[in-house]
Amino acid sequence: WQHGSPLILNIAPLEGALDMVREAGIDAIRKKSLAMTGYFMELIDEKLAKLGVEILTPREDDRRGGHVTILHVAASEITDFLDSGSRITDELKSAVREKMASGKPAGKDDQVRISFSPLYFSFEDVYMTAQNLEQLLGD
């Protein structure tokens, strides 16, 4: 069955979340989002570009949303790594090394989209994400 309107009990929990958005203000949320994605791109340039990470997201604030899309030959392993809470296993590290050593360039399917919710992520979380990716992709 399809409904034209959601059930009220299904949307009731949204009230608390929307209160947080109203309290923070959408302009402040957008400003922090841009600052976080800008900072993450700086960290990629500093720590991850030398490991084959390429930024696909536009760098201009007015052309960028709240995420950074990267291109890397080991994109599927990066996704698994981030989904696992940044746990590095021998198997994962081996798969990353194998793909990086293959010499195969990253293709259009080798993209990872990374976002940080400005309502509850901190700049330390952004830094730790870059550091964890550096540990995964580095020697």
How would you name each of these model-derived features?
Residues 1, 27, 68-69, 117-121:
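Short, contiguous acidic/charged loop-to-helix segments that flank catalytic cores in large enzymes
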Residues 1-8:
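A short glycine-threonine-serine/GTX helix/turn-capping micro-motif
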Residues 34-38, 45-86, 95:
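Conserved PLP-binding catalytic core of the aspartate aminotransferase-like
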